[in-house]
Amino acid sequence: MNKPLNFRFAVLSDLHVALPETVWQNLARIHLVEVGIPALEVALDRISEEDIDFLLVPGDLTQHGEAANHAWIAERFARLPYPVYVIPGNHDIPVLEANEQSIAADEFPGFYRMFGYEDTSRPYYTHEILPSVRLIGLNSNTFDVDGKQVGRMDESQLQWLRQTLSKSQAAGDELVMVMIHHNVLEHLPNQSTQGMGQRYMLENAAELLDILRAYNVKMVFTGHLHIQDVAYQDGIYDITTGSLISYPHPFRVFQYQTDRYNRHWLQMESHHVESVPGWENLKEQTRELMGDRGESYLLQLLTQAPLNLSEAKAKELVPSLRYFWTAVAEGDAVFNFSEFPEAAREYFESFGTTTAIDNRALLPMGEGRSHRRERLVSAAR
């Protein structure tokens, strides 16, 4: 990309919108779907002050694919003064065929004609959203022969992507941005190989990454994992944004800019919904909620590979991990578990970072440059 570019956009992810009549009553749930709509309204009010060119929403717009919730979101986004682009998350098309609760998978594009899906015949798309800026919205939800949902891109979509990127490259100097729900780079230690994190990654991420690198695509925006994290590998950033209904209730605002030396940068600022009616101290309340309801998750982390601790030993460590996952979700975490057995200490401290780039950063987008995570600029300029 040699052309100077300067534009501004926002990212909201994993909204899990649920109208009151569709809310599931589940006392074990750690995600607060009850605040989904008011939190979205607060975020949209804040974003309206940012003078953005467009908004990206990388999936999980609804609680569980309810037609009423899809219709509500489409109507709400239609009233916004800037373009919005969406893609489906696993919660948006949880079933192949419609049932009493959820829409059929192939119905999703029809709800979002105004938000990327002018062609409703397939669940992925591309648009030149600004001069010399192309967005590709991908679908990471497929179904196996038994009708089970799988986080994977099928071959027809991969072939379409190759053709789309080839045409973009032939047409001239375009900046390409990609949006997909499942993570394509690891945001947690060994996420691609260990069970509890593996399901949040695209099964055939390596194949997708090979295609993106072949066409010099640098930016991928994901969701699904409900954490704030920026991962980088061999020229590609996977910027995943946390969920609006769980701690820390984040959204992001970006400024893509070109400096006087024709170097390209992506400036990122993260913001949080701090309060909604009935939840005046929202972040602290949901932090405690996750602490109260997170024991079973922590026990799984401790008793499964790679630690494989006994249940008795795991229960001894759980109280010290009460706020572990909220710290991971907030991003830029630094951990010190010096009182833990060595293997457990090393494992849990590996979820932290030595460089704070998950929330506020200036990320280099220069051609052909290789920046390791620890060398990235952590202060916006």
Which ranges hold each PLM region?
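Active-site environment of divalent metal-dependent phosphoester hydrolases
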Residues: 18-21, 63-66, 90-98, 143-146, ...
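Active-site-proximal beta-strand elements of phosphoester/diester hydrolases
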Residues: 6-22, 132-142, 177-179, 237-242, ...
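His/acidic metal-ligating clusters that form di-metal
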Residues: 45-54, 134, 148-237, 324, ...
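Non-catalytic terminal accessory segments
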Residues: 1-4, 278-381
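Extended active-site neighborhood of metal-dependent phosphoesterases/phosphodiesterases
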Residues: 67, 71-166, 253
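N-terminal active-site segment of His-dependent metallophosphoesterases
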Residues: 1-70
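Beta-strand-turn-beta hairpins that frame and shape the catalytic cleft
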Residues: 2-10, 122, 126-140, 172, ...
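Acidic/histidine-rich helix-loop elements
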Residues: 13-38, 94-117, 144-153, 192-197, ...
